[in-house]
């Protein structure tokens, strides 16, 4: 479980976070930088998709690895990503999104923000807006 938690904290989180920043918040559009982070996200998604091949959750049973990874992967579109080639990830996201605790978590107002408002706040945080 720790290995997959660290996979999220050292891989998916930072790479997808940077993809989000350069795609939506950074004042200049730098296509090569955006593509670099998106490509790394896709590489990490391939690893995650393979891990989920014969499992309902990342480590078999639901764990902190799922709790940490889900919020990032659930917002894949924000990073300009698609998951059409990752059927195991799609199925995992569906299972997570159907769990009562995940549903309750997603009802938190922080997840209800308007994307444009989030972009405005993000740009302000990095000095771009």
Q: Where does each model-flagged region fall?
A:
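GST-like fold's C-terminal all-alpha helical module
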Residues: 4-98
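Acidic/histidine-enriched, glycine/proline-rich intrinsically disordered or flexible terminal extensions
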Residues: 109-129
């Amino acid at each position: 479980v720790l290995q997959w938690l660290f996979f999220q904290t050292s891989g998916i989180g930072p790479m997808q976070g940077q993809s989000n920043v350069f795609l939506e918040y950074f004042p200049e559009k730098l296509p090569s930088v955006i593509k670099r982070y998106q490509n790394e996200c896709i590489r990490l998604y391939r690893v995650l998709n393979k891990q989920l091949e014969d499992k309902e959750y990342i480590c078999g049973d639901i764990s902190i690895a799922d709790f940490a990874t889900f919020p990032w992967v659930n917002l894949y579109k924000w990073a300009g990503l698609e998951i059409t080639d990752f059927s195991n990830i799609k199925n995992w996201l569906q299972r997570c999104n159907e769990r009562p605790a995940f549903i309750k978590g997603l009802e938190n107002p922080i997840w209800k923000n308007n994307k444009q408002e989030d972009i405005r706040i993000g740009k302000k945080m990095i000095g771009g807006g």
